[in-house]
């Protein structure tokens, strides 16, 4: 609302900013009033993240904004697990190095802003993760170094590694499922934290605590710990007794049985993390196959020309497909398995008042 001499404005601001904004308004002769959101109003969601986690908010927002008043900020957890999972699935150190360099150069030269800056920053971080995991797996353009050394000297030079996914698939699967269980347990813990903060302590015990007993007990039983069987049985009994507590009559029994049937959902979620192993294997295998195809013609001039051509085309294709697959499946693990445990959506992002420009960048003048 505006007249010839006055302007009336209203909007939302974070509670932590009221003192600073109030001081600025007072210094400029403005009358103002702060108030909490009234019933029926629709305030936006403001997530205050540290710079390290801020970029990964762009991943969360692909799924949706948390509801206003949410007690759990998912961005720090998304940042940690997105960093880990993307690197495992892209899995080639040379690919990660290329991605890191491209992202770093773009950030330094183009100086993007807004969402573009956040996405490129995510690319920088996951590129670093890929270098780390690729080094663990000993994959640099697949087996390029052993292949080149064999073509040039007739002897293969092997790169030191900590885990060979091709030679040790079971260890790779255990690593993938283990990280998956940690991911799910964190999501369950966040759900319990939300319930407790909202005053539902016993719901957290019954709906989350008993499932911790079941899952941890089953893991213990699988590795030969006898007590794990009793833990799982105690958790199952707890779920059976309390699962139908909000229902009446026969529903208390059927509700408990229905809740206990949720074990199939948890097992399905855990098995879903086998995609970490599958994509990690596929990236290295395809890169290695390209190197093998390129080396079939031998060491002559034609052989080297063929090798360079197949290497360039094949590795570029594998890089593009690998980065797409790693992004899609990492997002899938966040959105379905992780967010499904605790995320409350339906919010809208807080958008601060600022100049929106397309082709120019406004810089703050230093006094």
Predicted ranges, named:
Residues 1-21:
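Coiled-coil termination/hinge junctions
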Residues 19-367:
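Conserved, carboxylate-rich catalytic/transport cores that coordinate ions
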């Amino acid at each position: 609302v505006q007249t010839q001499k006055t302007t009336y404005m209203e909007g939302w601001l974070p509670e932590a900013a009221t003192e600073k904004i109030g001081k600025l308004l007072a210094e400029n002769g403005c009358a103002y009033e702060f108030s909490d959101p009234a019933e029926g109003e629709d305030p936006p969601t403001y997530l205050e993240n540290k710079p390290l986690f801020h970029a990964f908010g762009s991943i969360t927002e692909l799924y949706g904004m948390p509801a206003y008043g949410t007690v759990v900020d998912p961005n720090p957890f998304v940042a940690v697990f997105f960093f880990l999972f993307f690197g495992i699935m892209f899995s080639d150190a040379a690919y990660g190095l290329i991605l890191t360099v491209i992202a770093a150069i773009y950030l330094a030269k183009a100086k993007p802003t807004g969402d573009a800056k956040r996405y490129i920053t995510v690319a920088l971080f996951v590129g670093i993760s890929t270098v780390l995991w690729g080094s663990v797996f000993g994959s640099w353009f697949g087996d390029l170094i052993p292949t080149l050394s064999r073509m040039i000297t007739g002897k293969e030079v092997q790169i030191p590694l900590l885990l060979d996914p091709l030679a040790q698939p079971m260890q790779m699967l255990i690593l993938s499922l283990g990280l998956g269980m940690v991911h799910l347990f964190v999501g369950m813990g966040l759900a319990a934290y939300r319930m407790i903060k909202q005053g539902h302590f016993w719901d957290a015990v019954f709906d989350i605590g008993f499932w911790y007993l079941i899952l941890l007990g089953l893991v213990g039983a699988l590795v030969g710990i006898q007590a794990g069987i009793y833990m799982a049985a105690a958790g199952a009994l707890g779920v059976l007794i309390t699962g139908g507590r909000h229902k009446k009559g026969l529903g208390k029994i059927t509700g408990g049985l229905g809740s206990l049937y949720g074990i199939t959902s948890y097992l399905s979620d855990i098995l879903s993390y086998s995609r970490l192993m599958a994509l990690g294997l596929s990236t290295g295998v395809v890169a290695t196959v390209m190197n093998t195809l390129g080396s079939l013609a031998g060491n002559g001039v034609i052989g080297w020309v063929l090798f360079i051509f197949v290497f360039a085309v094949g590795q570029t294709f594998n890089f593009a497909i690998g980065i797409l697959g790693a992004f899609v499946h990492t997002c899938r693990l966040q959105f379905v398995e992780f967010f499904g445990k605790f995320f409350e959506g339906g919010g809208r992002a807080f958008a601060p008042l600022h100049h929106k420009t397309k082709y120019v960048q406004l810089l703050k003048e230093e006094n």
